Swiss-Prot record:
Subunit-structure text: Homohexamer, and homodimer.
Gene name as annotated: ydaF
Protein's name according to its UniProt entry: Putative ribosomal N-acetyltransferase YdaF
Organism: Bacillus subtilis (strain 168)
One annotated Gene Ontology cellular component of this protein: cytoplasm
E.C. number: 2.3.1.-
Amino acid sequence: MFTCKVNEHITIRLLEPKDAERLAELIIQNQQRLGKWLFFAENPSSADTYRETIIPDWRRQYADLNGIEAGLLYDGSLCGMISLHNLDQVNRKAEIGYWIAKEFEGKGIITAACRKLITYAFEELELNRVAICAAVGNEKSRAVPERIGFLEEGKARDGLYVNGMHHDLVYYSLLKREWEGEK
């Protein structure tokens, strides 16, 4: 199954049922922060639901070549997630999503993991385009694609509905030729 070493501290890997307790715990601990922008944090699933349903679904999704929902590990400890979703192999494109627990912010984990997943998308999956979208008000999430060199394409007005509120989304993209030019 999918495991990708980013550097000596960071690993991206598919979650296993044994990760369910830690995942549920992280989401609950960060619920107020994550719930502003991510629907799943509004009413977090239980560890049992992650173990019995959600994690097995994510593993099937990967096996069926429909995307990657993976854990982010820092020094072996689960600290967040990263995904390659809306995978469209016909048009050779996908989107990246991510979140991280507050205690792990500021260590460059998300940026490094995104760079690794982008390389994987372009080199292994032979995609041509990777996109990231973030709520206009989610400055920390928006900083990631801006730091990496994504191009801001535009906004989707009221493109996100979470916590009973609509939020505008900013869309960013990076093309394979741009990524190769950065190296």
